[in-house]
Amino acid sequence: MKKYTILGGLMAATATLVFSQPSAAPVKKGTVEKITVHGKSLEGNLEGDSPDRDVFVYLPPSYATAKNRRYPVVYLLHGYGLSGERWVPFINLLDASDKTVAEGTAKEMILVSPDAFTIYSGSMYSSSPTTGDWETFIAEDLVSYVDSHYRTVANRMSRGLAGHSMGGYGTVRIGMKRPDVFSSMYIMSACCLMNNPGAGRGGQAAAKQPPPDSAKANGKNNGKGGRFGNVQAADAAAWSPNPSNPPQFFDLPVKEGELQPSIAAKWVANSPLAMVDQYVTNLKKYHAIAGDCGLQDGLVGSNKDLDASFTRLGIAHTFETYEGDHTNHVKERFEGSVLPFFSNNLTFMSGKK
């Protein structure tokens, strides 16, 4: 009995110690706002997509109370077939951002994600009379709006650009042209790095696609994402637009089974691997460039080619491969790699990176 009594007392004491431990402090919460930003650069696009774009803005936990504090901004570009509304949970934007702040793996930043879903399920973040000038919308219209409506550190050293898949393509495409706006970029599993219509990602499938009917052109596509059937049409609208070819206003690189060399050349010219040599000086102005891609991702080869091109051209950067496919580790990469990367490389109010 004595032995039992001592054990019982020990258990009681242990229980008291366990239950008397202070509870972990709750994670401070940021917020995500859905706003509308008018894109002057998107006005008059021949697809008929609205120039008024949904934009999702993450404001960190201290934003509501630290009224004199300003924050760096990271612009996040979603992939093809997604809307901005679907992209936010796809990367776990709110919880991942709050968690990294709470754990100290990233400092507080404003995160901005525009909706680039179009009638063909994606803008390709390109400049075209058919789609509108998405390059200028991102780098000028959107940045100007955010700087004028939020407490940002409004200079290039405090702006980052990142994206996944089509958004990775947009990050490279816009980033290499606009070092005056951004100082750091993170390229996640970029698509479309070499566009060769004669080898796989071509126009034959698009040639079988009817142009959008008037209902779609008038905006009745609900914008929820997930429509991958129009990918070649989206490419053509972005890279081989033709205002003289209604109703779709683009040319396809394959016609009746035959490659159209002049059109195919336009697609190649819109490939970052073909463009990069033109923008070496711009890319060397970046404070930091990083990229990643899953080893089981069908795009890993072209992403490795971009890494090799940067190395050949003396462009400082890092590139990492990991076990995974195109989508199954995006949330983990966003939380564990993307947010810490920008936290370490952007300039905050103190002037420290």
Where in the sequence are the language-model features?
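Bacterial N-terminal signal peptides that target proteins for export
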Residues: M1-G9
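Bacterial N-terminal signal peptides
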Residues: G8-T16
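Non-catalytic cap/lid and distal C-terminal segments of serine-dependent acyl enzymes
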Residues: Q21-K353
